[in-house]
Structure formats: structure tokens, C-alpha cells
């Protein structure tokens, strides 16, 4: 990012989920952190005390308590990133699209094993050391954290919605009128429609991906993508 952004829109799509995370486990009123160690047979998990007090503060500021044995991820890099964005942006918007939830849902009992997954050639696994350096490691985004840390640097929450509702609201205002083109074949137009469908259906990306919009230096705008359906 430049040192100063006088006016603009900072847009990201699947940026935050690719940032490194801390893996922690609830231990009564305390936390334990999972480190990467080196054992007799290669890389392995090592459970020790948290590496930073910021991990405890992260949950405290969101009023989140992990159950005994509950695993979770903490993306401190995302906290630093949104704080930096807020400090450098003087007027404009921050649009963050990614898969994840707000804290209340992200850290509920449906996610007792956390959300960290490894991807390689369309294969999903929780064996993070199987092909070290060759797998993509991703964890769900905590949008509550982005909201709270953004506020600390002047970003105001404009709105939060699912990708499905966001795109359908935009479509209602004619923003995808050129989705079909007379210059394309019927097969190409069909492919476009199918690709758009994957972005809005619950079975595709529609409800998995969320959209967080924040603004700074301007009145709260009435954005088409945030209008109720």
C-alpha cells in the first residue's frame, strides 16, 4: 500500500483467507497454541503456551470464549492489515470479499475443529504436513475482527451481507445487463450464466462468501449492493 491514499476503493477478493494464522485450543480459561515442531518423523504439532498476549486480547475484545478442547484460528495479520488500510485511507471505501463468518458463528460449537484446511489439486485435507510447501492452507475469515479493528483506525461499517444477496441486489439495478451478449455464441452465453449462478447459489459460493464494506471520510452511502431484496 502507498503511504497515503487520499481517495479510493481498496478491493480484495480471497486475500484475507490466504494470510497466516495462529492455531489455538481452548483450555479452561486459558489458551494453548499449536506450533510447528520437528519430530523423529518430520514436521509435527507442538502444543505450548501462546506466543503472544495479543491472542488472548483478540478473543476478549470480541467477547468470545472457546470451549474446552475447541480449536480455532486467529488471523493477527488481517488485524494489522485492516488497521494499516484505515490509517492510510483518507476518504473512500474498503470492500472485502472472502469466505468466513462473523465471530459469533465462526467460533460456535459447529466449528469445534476450527476451519483450517489444506488444498492441493482440488483435494481437501486436514493433513497440513503431508506436502509441506505444496498445499494451499486457508482458514475462514473473521469479519467481526475486521470490523472492530477497522473502527480503531477510522473505518466505519457500511454494511455486511452474503455474496449472493450482494450480487442479486446489484443485478436488480441492471448492473449485469451485459452478462449476455449478441456477439457471443449461445454456448458462451450459457457458460457465463452458469458461472454467475455458482456465485449466487447457496450450493456454490453464494452463502459461503461474505461481503464487508467499510467507508471513511464520507457520509454513509446508500449502496445498491446492500439494498434488501
Please tell me what each predicted stretch does.
Residues 1-28, 72-76, 80, 86-95:
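A short SAM/SAH-binding and catalytic strip from SAM-dependent methyltransferases
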Residues 5, 23-32, 39, 44, ...:
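Residues in flexible loops and secondary-structure boundaries
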Residues 8-59, 110-119, 228:
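A mobile, often basic/glycine-rich helix-loop segment
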Residues 55-229:
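Long, Lys/Arg- and hydrophobic-enriched amphipathic alpha-helices
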Amino acid at each position: 500500500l502507498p503511504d497515503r491514499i487520499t481517495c479510493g476503493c481498496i478491493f480484495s477478493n480471497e486475500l484475507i483467507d490466504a494470510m497466516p494464522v495462529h492455531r489455538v485450543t481452548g483450555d479452561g480459561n486459558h489458551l494453548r497454541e499449536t506450533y510447528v515442531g520437528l519430530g523423529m518423523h518430520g514436521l509435527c504439532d507442538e502444543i505450548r503456551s501462546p506466543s503472544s498476549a495479543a491472542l488472548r486480547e483478540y478473543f476478549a475484545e470480541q467477547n468470545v470464549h472457546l470451549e474446552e478442547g475447541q480449536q480455532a484460528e486467529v488471523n493477527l495479520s488481517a488485524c494489522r492489515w485492516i488497521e494499516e488500510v484505515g490509517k492510510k485511507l483518507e476518504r473512500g471505501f474498503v470492500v472485502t470479499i472472502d469466505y468466513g463468518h462473523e465471530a459469533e458463528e465462526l467460533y460456535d460449537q459447529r466449528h469445534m475443529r476450527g476451519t483450517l484446511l489444506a488444498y492441493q489439486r482440488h483435494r481437501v485435507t486436514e493433513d497440513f504436513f503431508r506436502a509441506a510447501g505444496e498445499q494451499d492452507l486457508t482458514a475462514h475469515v473473521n469479519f467481526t475482527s475486521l470490523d472492530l479493528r477497522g473502527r480503531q483506525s477510522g473505518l466505519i461499517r457500511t454494511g455486511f451481507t452474503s455474496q449472493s444477496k450482494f450480487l442479486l441486489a446489484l443485478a436488480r439495478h441492471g448492473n449485469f445487463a451485459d452478462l449476455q451478449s449478441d456477439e457471443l455464441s449461445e454456448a458462451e452465453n450459457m457458460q457465463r450464466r452458469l458461472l454467475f449462478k455458482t456465485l449466487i447459489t447457496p450450493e456454490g459460493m453464494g452463502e459461503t462468501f461474505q461481503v464487508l464494506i467499510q467507508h471513511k471520510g464520507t457520509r454513509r452511502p446508500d449502496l445498491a449492493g446492500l439494498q434488501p431484496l
